[in-house]
Amino acid sequence: PMYVNAVTNLVNMVFNFLLIYPSRTVELLGRSFEIWGAGLGVAGAAWGTAIAFVVGFVLMVFAVCRNHLISPIGFPLKPNLEILLRVWKITLPNIMQRLVLCLGQISFTALITGLGTIPLAAHSIAITAEQAFYMPGSGFQAAATTLSGQALGAGDKDKLKKIISTAGRISVIVLTCTGFLLFLFPSVIMSVFTPDQEVIARGAEVLRLVSISEPFFGLTMVLEGAFNGMGDTKPSFYISLFTMWCLRILPAYICVKVFGLGLVAVWWCMVADVISRSMLLLARYLRGRWLKALK
């Protein structure tokens, strides 16, 4: 998957570069080069992304077929209804969670749009910058998902607990360090994306604020990954539904529409969502109800 994603992103960048902009002359090392471009604008971006996704799909299918452990070659095409029902039972809550979070993000951005151009620009850039700093947590989430599923299959309760505990602690430590960088150098980070001083100032303010939630987000990703690896996907959905809409969107709406507050207040609502989700998932883990999956 890492290699496929790398190729997909490279294809995406190349085709976006060629399809969005018109033909132009580029100066490099004192020489002029004519670079072809389709000049399609937004449509070019869509085509470039679509081509990249198709390339990624083909490469992933090829990789799956080459892997003797998961290759479908040689197996009958008749669907197994029992397996399909089990897959659907695990998948549906995860789909609903993604939908809840996606709609929540759209609603959250819509609220910020009403604050004006500068707050919206600061929000968009700060979100992009923050994503780069919590990226290590995604790796720990993938590890927790894979290893938890293996431990569950082996019926090893002690190993399962150790995997979750170890991955959770490392993720919290790493994201505490990245959060520390966000807190110390928010203006430097914002200046990488924009030269506008007002946007930098507003974005730096919220980046420093959100830095306190990074360790909690690291724990959230590991616990969600572990629960997903065990097939226990419903709790993550219910918790995300509650925290996103009751602790982020509703309070943010009240802050903006009722009290006329700005970007910082809205981001406090986001921080409350992240921390609360982490604590609720941790509470479920400590209660041990997920151990029923081993029985």
Predicted regions, residues:
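Transmembrane alpha-helix boundary and packing residues in multipass membrane permease domains
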Residues: 17, 49, 62, 94, ...
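Transmembrane helical elements of multi-pass membrane transporters/channels
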Residues: 8, 52-56, 60, 64, ...
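Helix-terminus/linker motif at the lipid-water interface of multi-pass membrane proteins
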Residues: 15-24, 31-40, 99-132, 150, ...
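Short runs within selected transmembrane alpha-helices of multi-pass transporters and secretion channels
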Residues: 1-9, 45-60, 138-141, 210-229, ...
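Short alpha-helical transmembrane segments in multi-pass integral membrane proteins
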Residues: 27-92, 148-213, 255-295
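Hydrophobic alpha-helical transmembrane segments of multipass membrane transporters and ion channels
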Residues: 3, 7, 93-101, 129, ...
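Alpha-helical transmembrane segments of multipass membrane proteins
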Residues: 10-18, 61, 106-110, 132, ...
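Small-residue-rich hydrophobic transmembrane alpha-helices
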Residues: 1, 109, 122-186, 217-240
